[in-house]
Amino acid sequence: MKEYSYNIINDVYNWMISRKKDIEVRILKEKSQAIQVGDIITFNNQDIVGKYVKVKIANKTIVDNVYELTEKFEIERMMPGHSKEELIELMKNIYGEELNQKQIVAFEFEYLCCDSEVEFIEYNEKYLEDIKDLLVEL
């Protein structure tokens, strides 16, 4: 098991710590080629110093292009709340011509920890119905 690090923007950081995003996509280069299942990646928030998310690689898939990527994986797992077109446009803006010249790697990951633990509260359907009824009464 080896450890690697990448920089991410604050939106991606928030998606990761909230467990909405569990696939990170990169252009296949020497570093991303070397990362294997079981390796650890620390994603550092480039917008806020000291904020990070640590994950373990559960699966690694290499595809030939962004269209194959969007066929294999749900957009919501890569870019929550956005469309296929928005993901493709973002990748074109980030990688430019490289996007058409190199393969793409998708890292499916398991969340390990972050700089500050976030507590998640899960509600069952009954509770949600009770809340809806309460809101209607207000």
Annotate each language-model stretch with its function:
Residues 38-46:
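Short conserved beta-strand and strand-loop elements enriched in small hydrophobics
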